[in-house]
């Protein structure tokens, strides 16, 4: 290396023309080098193809699956007794001297009948009550029947009903009610707190834990806000009795929504009416069905129509003897309905008409121009709706100058019966079983008295009928897909009615996965 020659690492950058000279001196490509390059390219392409095929295969070809059945056990829940609560005695908001207007007391003792398909029914009164009836014959009664231990899935049928004819001072009339299962959510449609009308709310808790109850109240002017409607404690095996006027005074058309936590309850309204110095009847109003778009009310019994009409025309304060349909729909907006009044067996004058009302406000629709007879009322609405009918009865001697005994009943909507059901007929005058079939198919049902032979009843589509039954007896209804039923009692200046209840469920096995 000369003194002026730089080492390779220190060679200066070449100008473009010098690069061309360098390139010209590089070793030219030979056939062997071309072949090596070609093989490498082919190998790369083949590798890429293999990768592509592998990916496609993983997507398109089924992958092997591994499955196993998780361990499980078929468990039959411990069967529990069927249980219902009968409301107990008719109550008044005072003691037996007429004093103590903030307390309640019983007016006699109801007659209660009950039966079970197992043949065993236990009765026990609630042990506490605001009406001081705890542990007595006037208290609400819990009826229960044990399950079939050998077959827990068997549905045990249980039913009960009570009635009470009262004739004491301002309280005159007939009240009847079914015994009902407890619920955490129920609606009451009926009653009034207008002048001369007293309505009590009764809450019965047959469970072993206290129930905390909240109330929502609605009237003809909408929702009603009042202190004391939340956090109402109903003790275990206890009854609370509350004056509805304490929450909603001067309300003509109340509707009450009852919800509970902890223990579950049954809820009823008890209404009594006094017109001046004349008693105007009484009733026990049970819970109705939840809001629905198709509501069926069987058992509208129109008797002694001439006496009622005489009082309506000439007597002051008798306006609420008029048969009326009470409607309420939760929410907002306009509710469109079609109201149909259908005579039983095609006897009587029916009617059907459209009606609109505001959701969130209680509406009342007079039902006029009915002849004496029995009817089913049906409401088809575009919004889930609650409904009940008030009907009155007057003794034949009633006139505007000398009014005889009058009575009224609130007819709650019936629950659809979709399987074999049992009902007990309360004791009282001229009991009738009302059956309605609002469906589009004919129904053939069998009515069987306890220990008796069955009677087949054919009911065409859209028809209803009534059958005489025996007070205090229990009947089984079977052989149908869907129907509605109610029991009514009526005499001179007396009327009562209640809906049949569906059967309770058995203890079906359930599968538990571990």
Protein language model features and the residues they cover:
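Conserved functional hotspot residues at active sites or interaction interfaces
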Residues: 34-51, 56-99, 163-202, 268-330, ...
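Extracytoplasmic/periplasmic/luminal assembly and interaction segments
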Residues: 92-138
């Amino acid at each position: 290396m000369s003194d002026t020659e730089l080492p390779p690492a220190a060679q200066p950058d070449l100008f473009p023309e010098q690069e061309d000279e360098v390139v010209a001196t590089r070793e030219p490509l030979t056939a062997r080098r071309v072949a090596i390059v070609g093989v490498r390219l082919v190998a790369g392409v083949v590798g890429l193809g293999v990768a592509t095929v592998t990916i496609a295969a993983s997507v398109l070809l089924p992958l092997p699956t591994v499955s196993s059945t998780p361990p499980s056990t078929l468990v039959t829940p411990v069967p529990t007794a069927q249980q219902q609560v009968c409301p107990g005695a008719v109550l008044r908001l005072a003691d037996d001297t007429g004093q103590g207007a903030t307390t309640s007391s019983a007016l006699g003792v109801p007659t209660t009948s009950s039966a079970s398909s197992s043949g065993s029914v236990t009765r026990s009164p609630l042990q506490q009550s605001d009406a001081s009836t705890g542990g007595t014959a006037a208290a609400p009664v819990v009826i229960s029947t044990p399950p079939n231990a050998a077959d827990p899935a068997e549905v045990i049928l249980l039913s009960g009903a009570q009635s009470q004819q009262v004739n004491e001072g301002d309280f005159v009339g007939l009240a009847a009610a079914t015994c009902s299962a407890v619920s955490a959510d129920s609606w009451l449609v009926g009653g009034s707190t207008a002048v001369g009308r007293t309505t009590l709310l009764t809450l019965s808790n047959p469970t072993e834990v206290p129930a905390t109850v909240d109330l929502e109240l609605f009237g003809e002017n909408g929702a009603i806000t009042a202190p004391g409607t939340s956090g109402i404690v109903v003790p275990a095996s206890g009854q609370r009795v509350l004056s509805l006027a304490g929450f909603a005074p001067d309300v003509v058309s109340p509707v009450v929504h009852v919800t509970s936590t902890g223990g579950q309850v049954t809820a009823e309204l008890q209404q009594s009416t006094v017109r001046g110095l004349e008693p105007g009847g009484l009733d026990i109003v049970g819970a109705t069905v939840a809001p629905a778009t198709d509501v069926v009310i069987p058992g509208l019994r129109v008797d002694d129509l001439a006496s009622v009409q005489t009082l309506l025309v000439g007597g002051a304060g008798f306006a609420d003897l008029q048969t009326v349909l009470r409607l309420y729909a939760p929410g907002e907006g306009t509710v469109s309905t079609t109201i149909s009044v259908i005579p039983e067996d095609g006897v009587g004058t029916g009617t059907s008409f459209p009606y609109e009302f505001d959701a969130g406000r209680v509406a009342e629709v007079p039902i006029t121009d009915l002849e004496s007879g029995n009817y089913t009322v049906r409401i088809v609405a575009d919004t889930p709706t609650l409904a009940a009918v008030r009907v009155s009865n007057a003794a034949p001697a009633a006139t505007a100058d000398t009014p005889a005994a009058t009575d009224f009943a609130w007819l709650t909507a019936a629950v659809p019966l979709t399987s074999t059901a049992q009902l007990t007929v309360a004791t009282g005058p001229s009991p009738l079983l009302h059956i309605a079939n609002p469906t589009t198919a004919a129904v053939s049902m069998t009515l069987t008295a306890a220990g008796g032979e069955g009677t087949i009843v054919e009911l065409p589509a859209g028809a209803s009928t009534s059958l005489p039954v025996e007070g205090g007896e229990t009947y089984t209804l079977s052989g149908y897909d869907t129907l509605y039923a109610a029991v009514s009692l009526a005499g001179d200046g007396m009327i009562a009615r209640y809906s049949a209840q569906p059967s309770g469920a058995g203890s079906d096995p359930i599968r538990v996965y571990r």
